[in-house]
Amino acid sequence: MSLQISPIPAHPQGECFLTAAEGRVILPASIPVDTIGRRIQVEWDPDAPVTPLGQLVFFCQFLAAGGLYSKWVAECPLRYTSPNAPKIRDVLGTWVLGCLSGAWRYAHVTALRGDKVNPQGLGMEKVVSEDSLRRAFQNEDRVALACWQKEALLRTYAPALEQPWIADLDVTVKPIYGHQEGADIGYNPHKPGRPSHAYHTVFLRTLRVALDVDVRSGKEHAAMHGLSNLWSLWDRLTPGQRPWVVCGDAGYGNERLMSECEARVQKYLFRQRSTTKVGQLVKLLEQRGGWQPLLDGWEGNEGLLQLTGWTCKRRTIVLRRKRPESAVGLEKLPLLTGQEVELVSGPVYEYVVLVTSLEENLLSLMHLYRQRADVENAYDELKNQWGWGGFTTRDLGRCQVAACMVAQVYNWWNLFVRCAEPSRAREALTSRPLLLHAVGRVIKSGGQTKLIITSNHAEAREVQDILSKLSLFLSGLTNAAEQLKSEERWRRIWHRILEPFHQQATALLGGSG
């Protein structure tokens, strides 16, 4: 007769709390937690109307006053046929909340689904799931989506184009770790051999506003691949809205772009790489002399340059400065980083060569080029603080949609911060804890809804003053001036943003902020 051996569970049950029917664990109402120095009773309240983004209500007021958000939602070409599909307003609102909270993957929006306060401020019913957000634009027409997003971006920055401004061109590389469309091996200085996407972007200088972005495969990182998007943007603008000058780094100083600028009577300022003929020009200027002292030890001279393949000679500016005695000094150069400095001739000086169609003096041209450093800061903020290049999917089309989504929310938030405190600019790393993060608790009584905000920021008093003044300004636009259309209200918001720029005629050509 065989022995009957009873199975022994691998994990002893111990003490547990079970319901009689389902056999589910019953969690205790409170848990004693022994911390350093004292015991604390912990309770959960998953249904409490609270939010960690309590000050988002002021951003919602900002969007409502400008009328941009409602029009953005109304014109969205996204269409659902299933009765169980999420609402378009919920999908777009989840995008806004996700970007503002610092998400860079679709899975990150799951952390927002318990927020029962902020979705109401954006006219939402709920925060949608990550799968709904990921699949939202999967089967939509790419042309219709591009037109919708480009028009929304244009409405955001259009009032700023009524005065002279500078368009900065740049491209950044985003490493890809999956098998996405367009993930090709191209130029990738930080991770050589790693597939990537290339983001070709046009920025509005000084205000750090992203005008447009074009996502390309990793092999299409050269400047020429972003020209079609540049001229598409340029053609959408009226003659009075077009940039005063287009600026770019060494990759943009080529015959194709410069000849197209000249055909459109568009002024430009581009840096040149070190080539044989560039070196010959520098040697010629060294022999001729006549260097003018400029700023921070830099001197300038100019001549005419025609490289092989160029159709004509062009004005070329050469800037030089004595090389530091050590590499440490080189890293501290205020004009260009060590990677951007190119030695063209001789061991004594370092040189920067610019080609331009402008007629301004050498000091003005040097100042214009130095301001390009702000574009690098904007790229750094978008990639590291806004998750630009995140929200990656297998198809390149949705990566393009995600890049424009992030750019749109980035613009709105930056302008909100500027409107709240026009005298200074803040990156998201400091502006979110200051103007967004705070515990918000909703109390409903007597038919009214009250939001009680508690901020743990050291400058909470100053923040309360800043946001209160902003709210009064926005309320004045919507209440005291009800006859104003949304476009005029948005124009007045821009007027407040540009107040710190003392010379309005040249506000966006440099200066404050």
Question: Locations of the language-model features?
Answer:
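Short secondary-structure boundary/capping segments
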Residues: 181-186, 260-266, 283-289
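Basic, amphipathic alpha-helical segments enriched in Lys/Arg and hydrophobic/aromatic residues
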Residues: 389-453
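Short amphipathic alpha-helical "interface-anchor" segments enriched in bulky aromatics
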Residues: 62, 109, 362-405, 409-413
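Short, conserved catalytic/metal-binding motifs centered on acidic residues
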Residues: 62, 94-95, 109, 129, ...
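Flexible loop/turn segments at secondary-structure boundaries
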Residues: 116-119, 174-176, 209, 219-220, ...
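An anionic, glycine-rich sequence signature occurring as long contiguous blocks
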Residues: 3-4, 27-38, 42, 267-377, ...
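Domain-level cores of phosphate- or acyl-group-handling catalytic modules
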Residues: 220-280
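Dynamic "connector" segments at or just before major functional cores
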Residues: 2-194, 199-239, 440-513
